[in-house]
UniProtKB/Swiss-Prot annotation:
The gene is Ccdc97. This is Coiled-coil domain-containing protein 97. Keywords: Acetylation, Coiled coil, Nucleus, Phosphoprotein. It is found in: Nucleus. Residues 229-258 form a coiled coil. May play a role pre-mRNA splicing through the association with the splicing factor SF3B complex which is involved in branch-site recognition. Residues 1-62, 200-220, 239-272, 289-310, 321-340 are annotated as: Disordered. It holds the Pfam family CCD97-like_C.
């Protein structure tokens, strides 16, 4: 009896491989491994790279396109601990595919905001379920309002980026704006600068450099680079002036009026208050130029595709309306009166 009891105790002891032999009864010698417990399964499901990333190759084209679209969006695919590395797109696609096949209704509920109308065909097998029908109808409504929603989101993100750049000060400095739009700068500001202001612009003061007392304040490399930038800017200015003159030559009827206005502008010298108004108008036009996406050297994808710019202060809404008045109430009322 003692030997049999010892044998039973031995049968209950798990080995190092994680395989726990089943409890045996009298005369039973089976040592079939038992399956993992529910906690182990839950832990495995939370692991981002459980599904093989190559399994997405077996998906239908419609399902694969849907999974990749959601993986590329800003929607979180799964919860992660702080400090964990971000999931790659193949890992996201694998996790999404696993959830779609195991729990399609949960998938639809969780990621419906990232779905488009063409993705609804992937949930045809859920038709008839009142919850699935409700979520699919919501996706269809989003598709109808999506262009306007995307346009509003785009302008809000650019406006938030504009405020950030204005606070930074560098992007909308005189030097940067002059380099981006030399002709516009010359028309509003450059032609009215005094000789002292021109000299200050040519040799802008720099912060003292550390080193020996004999170190020059303006190294040769900086002077050469500044000279190169100035030549490039002058070439750009000349090109824009030639393009503008070509446009004026096409309007032959107004040539005389243009010449008169040019003479008047040459004779007119604005005072300090008028120069301030010109500067404000120039800066406002540069702001609008940025919002319209006309700054060729700026990577707008860093703003348009960045959800971090979605949080706008409610206090700034009034100021935002100055830039984005898509419909003027006076225009609408006048159109209605004209129709009567």
């Amino acid at each position: 009896m003692e030997a049999v009891a010892a044998a039973e105790v031995t049968e209950r002891k798990p080995d190092n491989d994680g395989v726990e032999p089943r409890v045996v009864h009298w005369g039973e010698l089976s040592q079939t491994p038992i399956p993992s417990g529910p906690q182990e399964k839950e832990t495995a499901e939370r692991t981002p790279d459980i599904p093989n990333s190559g399994s997405s190759q077996a998906e239908s084209p419609a399902v694969s396109a849907m999974l990749h679209a959601i993986a590329a969006s800003h929607l979180p695919v799964c919860s992660q601990q702080q400090g964990e590395p971000d999931l790659t797109e193949p890992e996201k696609v694998a996790i999404l595919g696993q959830l779609y096949h195991k729990k399609p209704l949960v998938f639809l509920e969780r990621f419906r905001t990232g779905l488009r109308e063409e993705h609804l065909a992937c949930f045809g097998h859920l038709r008839g379920d009142h919850r699935a029908d409700f979520y699919c109808a919501e996706v269809a409504r989003q598709g109808t309002a999506r262009p306007r929603t995307l346009r509003t989101r785009l302008r809000n993100r650019r406006y938030a980026a504009l405020r950030e750049l204005i606070q930074g000060g560098e992007y909308f400095s005189d030097e940067q704006m002059r380099f981006r739009a030399p002709l516009l700068y010359e028309q509003y500001i450059g032609q009215y600068l005094t000789q002292e202001e021109l000299n200050a612009r040519t040799a802008a003061p720099q912060a003292p450099r550390s080193g020996s007392p004999g170190t020059p304040a303006y190294p040769l490399s900086d002077l050469l680079f500044q000279s190169y930038q100035e030549r490039e800017l002058q070439q750009k200015l000349l090109q824009q002036q030639e393009e503008e003159e070509a446009c004026f030559e096409e309007e032959e009827d107004s040539d005389e009026e243009d010449q008169r206005s040019d003479k008047d502008s040459e004779a007119w010298v604005p005072d300090s208050e008028e120069r301030l108004i010109l500067r404000e108008e120039f800066t406002s036009r540069m702001h609008q130029r940025f919002l319209d996406g006309k700054d060729g050297g700026f990577d707008y994808s860093t703003v348009d595709d960045n959800p971090d710019f979605d949080n706008l202060d409610i206090v700034a809404r009034d100021e935002e309306d100055r830039y984005f008045d898509e419909e003027e109430p006076e225009d609408v009322s006048s159109a209605e009166l004209g129709g009567d």
